[in-house]
């Protein structure tokens, strides 16, 4: 019998990726977040498309066009809040996805891991540009402060910033180009996701034990399709609780004030998912040093496969490494909290200590403890 699912050129690709894909039999719920990220991306593209139909990328009308979407467009309010809180869901899943990769040693699949880092940077750039579009106070000043960081680059910095702005300050040209980039980037992200999956399917998934799964595999469908569906339902529940009960919980009240270049808000801060990096940036008094620390805080992920000293791939049976992993998690929570606080004592000191601890844990303590564990296990 000619099975269309297995023989049709397009269906065959879908079949080998999502239906007959051999998957490890023991992957836990921490492996759900890849599919949840795919769902978040789809949600963002769909809601974003409908928002773009009513939004105007002009400094005089951008703010009122967002208000118009919420007030006059049919279900515009839910589309807008799904898009805004969808970004938070996206980053929540992203951080858990990366955390799982660190804990279970998935970074040893270097091509997939490096592709993931490129994806992280692209998603962060997209989210930043999206935050500028409503043209509220925090949008305008966030754009000014973050783009201004590029002026720390020696020699070409100032020219680079003015080139990005399209003038001598954040203005109409900046908003228009940010909208254009914000629209195109999710489609680039989709293409990168396909490459990410291509690399993953070359090697197959890791599992909680960190061992080879070749001896025991099960088909992706129905086992993991059902499992992913449960994760999706829980994510939808969380998203709907946010959107329908407290849609502005994660936003900034300052963004309900139209952008005013003549009045600076008392505390300029980005969305919650950038606060950890923002805290690291602020903890260094030097501008260039701060920018380097900011970039390093994310780029450090690229050298994690090199820093992996343990003979075991996963942290499942390495209690000392587990302690350091959860210390790192707690440290990131502290940095996120500090990023949202004003620049004054004691927050400055706490931020500096947390920033030093972040780099020390990853660069020194984790590799050292891995070597100690190897010795303890007589490896």
UniProtKB/Swiss-Prot annotation:
Keyword tRNA processing belongs to the record: no
The protein's required cofactors: heme b
Record-listed heme b b562 binding positions: 83, 182
Cystine pairings recorded for this chain: none
Transmembrane portions of the chain: 33-53, 77-98, 113-133, 178-198, 226-246, 288-308, 320-340, 347-367
Topology versus the membrane: Multi-pass membrane protein
Molecular-function annotations in GO: metal ion binding; ubiquinol-cytochrome-c reductase activity
PROSITE patterns reported in the protein's UniProt record: CYTB_CTER, CYTB_NTER
Pfam families: Cytochrom_B_C, Cytochrome_B
Record-level GO cellular component terms: mitochondrial inner membrane; respiratory chain complex III
Domain of life: Eukaryota
Similarity field: Belongs to the cytochrome b family.
Task performed by this protein: Component of the ubiquinol-cytochrome c reductase complex (complex III or cytochrome b-c1 complex) that is part of the mitochondrial respiratory chain. The b-c1 complex mediates electron transfer from ubiquinol to cytochrome c. Contributes to the generation of a proton gradient across the mitochondrial membrane that is then used for ATP synthesis.
Subunit and interaction comment: The cytochrome bc1 complex contains 11 subunits: 3 respiratory subunits (MT-CYB, CYC1 and UQCRFS1), 2 core proteins (UQCRC1 and UQCRC2) and 6 low-molecular weight proteins (UQCRH/QCR6, UQCRB/QCR7, UQCRQ/QCR8, UQCR10/QCR9, UQCR11/QCR10 and a cleavage product of UQCRFS1). This cytochrome bc1 complex then forms a dimer.
Additional free-text comment from the UniProt record: Heme 1 (or BL or b562) is low-potential and absorbs at about 562 nm, and heme 2 (or BH or b566) is high-potential and absorbs at about 566 nm.
Protein name: Cytochrome b
